[in-house]
A protein has these predicted regions:
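Short catalytic micro-motifs in class I SAM-dependent methyltransferases
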Residues: 113-117
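Helix-to-beta-strand junctions that scaffold the AdoMet/dcAdoMet cofactor pocket
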Residues: 118-120, 134-136
Length: 203
């Protein structure tokens, strides 16, 4: 997919800068506590779009008993994550391409600010791929924007963003039979109330 490849190249080129400006590993601390209470105590969890390991401190602290696996489409991000957390498992993976995903069944998933980079016409494939690698009835976490979330001037940002309304997001989750357990509005770096986070349960 052209859009995903363009986004990958962006992160491979600008990943170091992105990592150094996205430093709040605990921005999602409150929902993470909820997730840990829903996931099996020693469950295997996949972090989809792990970047340079920005959310790993949550897993090493609050979720320290969980078995962590991080995937990302960017080689640079995987290199950074592996350097920072050599005791954990990271690998290249594209959530829209099942052939690149781990051949495991996970007890839950974490997908913060990543599903938006896949064009909407490929969401059915992407969501099916998530279902294939996670156990039935497992819980997951996703964040999606309702407006463009980037602090970069939009015409200078070549990454793909799928922007749909909150109602459209919820309708899509319902169409997939993903049960909505929690929904909260979050501020972005440069825009208020831009993010919706969802804790979901798969069918």
């Amino acid at each position: 997919m052209k859009e995903i490849e363009t986004t990958r190249k962006y992160y491979d080129k600008h990943g170091d800068h992105w990592i150094n400006t996205k430093t709040n590993s605990f921005a999602h601390e409150k929902p993470f506590h909820k997730l840990v209470s829903l996931w099996p105590e020693k469950g295997r969890i996949i972090d989809i779009g792990c970047a340079g390991g920005i959310h790993v401190p949550l897993f090493l602290g609050i979720g320290r008993k969980l078995k962590y696996q991080g995937i990302d489409i960017s080689k640079l991000f995987i290199k950074i994550a592996t350097r920072r957390y050599p005791q954990l498992s990271f690998s290249l993976g594209n959530v829209a391409d099942s052939t690149t995903l781990p051949k495991l069944k996970f007890d839950g998933f974490y997908a913060s600010a990543i599903l938006m980079h896949v064009p909407f016409e490929h969401w059915d494939t992407m969501f099916s791929n998530i279902e294939k690698i996670t156990k039935p009835g497992s819980y997951g976490y996703i964040t999606l924007p309702i407006t463009h979330p980037s602090a970069v001037k939009q015409d200078a940002d070549v990454r793909h963003f799928t922007i749909i309304t909150e109602a459209e997001q919820i309708d899509y989750l319902k169409k997939r039979n993903w049960k909505l357990k929690q929904k909260v509005t979050l501020d972005g770096t440069s825009t208020a109330n831009v993010w919706r986070y969802y804790i979901v349960q798969l069918p």
